[in-house]
Amino acid sequence: EIVETGSDGLVLARHELPFSVRLGDFMLETYPGTTRPSGFRSVVQITDLDTRKTFAAEIWMNHELHHRGYALFQSSYRQQDGREATVLSVAKDPGQSIVFAGYILLVVGMLVVLFTRIQQARVVSAGLEQQAAARRSGKSRTVPGAVVVLLALLAASAAPAAGISTDVLRRLPVQHDGRAMPLDTYAREAVWTITGSYAWQGEDPTATVTGWLFDPPAAADAPLVKIGSSDLAGALGLSSMTHASFHQLADNPRLRQLTQDARHQAQEQRPRQGVLQDAEKLEARLMTMQEVLQRESVRPLPVPGNPKARWAVPSAVTAESLAALARGPRQPGWPSPEQIDREILYNQVNPVRLSWIILLVSLGLSVLGWGRPGPGLDRCAFGFLIGGFGMMSWGIGMRWLAGDRIPAANMYESMLFLAWGVGFFAVLAYGLLHNKTVVLNAAIMAALTMALTDLLPIDRFIHPIAPVLAGTPWLAIHVPIIMVAYSVLALGLVIAHMQIGFTIFKPRGFDVIARMSELLYWYMFVGSILLIAGIFTGSMWAASSWGRYWGWDPKEVWSLVAFLAYMAILHAKHAGYLARFGIAVSSILAFQTIIMTYLGVNFVLATGMHSYGMGDSPVVMWMVIVALAEATFLVWGWAAYRKHAASPAVR
């Protein structure tokens, strides 16, 4: 068969395998109590055509079968007319080990260059420090205005529902979304899903949900279901409302028509956007609310002898019956009391919020100590930075234990690792360099990331992961490496802005600009090494899952573009094509490729295996706003640079 590709032809030939493959059985595994796949595997019989020997084997995601130089992979499966069909792929790549060896050599080579640069920097550091000290001795110190940060923690009320203590009910184990959890966790997710708020009207989520359970008529008439958008509200004839009651929405003929149109487009495999997409989300919120009103959502009774079965609802869902279950003997299949207490503690502490508050304190102390003599404030700032990093680490660990997997499978969890990577690298860098700028820019970036993670309307709850992410160590290797790479490059972004800011407002700050430029170089160098290591580990993961280590997926392409952008800057600096200001500007521009890789592919392109399918997301608008703000800042910096171009520090 000939496939035309321009003036050339690509020949596709049929290749006979030296063995036959016969499917004996296909097993689709689901998360407990759901129909969501947790894994799927094929039981096959392999018959060697030369020796006629037959053996049985199993193939599942991330666990390929090797025979006579070939590898068989479980790619996917299909369900049609009530039958399941497995999809296997085959690969033969005798050069794979050579490719992987090349990966290792490239990373090792970059590390050798990094250590060489460090050694060269140490040779000249003594002289530079003496020159800087001489310049500082003739100048008076200036102290910038103090940054005053007002911190307020709002405690949610814990009003009991139906006269029963919520502290008893919140510890009741229930099954939801494929796992067992305390009622406290389910209540928080239900309240957020239905109302769009983590604490509806400031009330304890457990009290809110039990109130709905024990008084369904009042809950159905209360305007608490989030509509989702002003366009959808207008289409439903509810223009002035952000929330409506269950009855208002369930009986709305316009909503029924919109959801029917959305289902029709889904059957035709057409994307749903705008009002149709909002209507689908609203329908999902109504389904969640309906389960609560019908008392089908709280399932605390495991099925004996069947850990995968959906748990049962008590015959009478009353405050007394649920409290009796919570106080009674532990049911087989329930999490241990320690697991329940640990997850409730994680929910109540809210380590994400607490960490960015601690990091804000670190930022304030770092700013106050910037122009002051003595290391006191700097050490305090570093101490709070360690405290914020410790709280982030504790939160990630607790989430890992609750979900029984590394928390690195969705947007929210990736942002956790982004902020954690900033703190981790900053602690290491400050320990090595003792540079107060490290603490300042790390506190800025980590506090901003954790604040956005906490305040943006992102789903923060633990959900089942796709089969390709489960049962493999690559999730715990690839994602942390790539996110720490983004973290280090984000630190470089902050320091580049600080450097250009000094060019604008304090162009004669020779020492500070020089130190910032040097720090920016190290950030870009280390970040680039981590970035290529992340690309390589992702490639190895793809090779073990699908038999190919590069598929030109949009995320793969943009990761490569980002790496090449930073490599161009580093080579241009080494060749003398870029000076300090040019490096700072180039690093800000290069980070736009990181934003495109991290957010653009997921939310703008909305294509590829890494996409979250949100092509009309507000993220698009914010990316444009950020790009315009960056362009304005760079033009301002360029004007200041041209004005003070004679200064050696600015150059």
Name each model-derived stretch:
Residues 1-651:
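Solvent-exposed, non-transmembrane regions of integral membrane proteins
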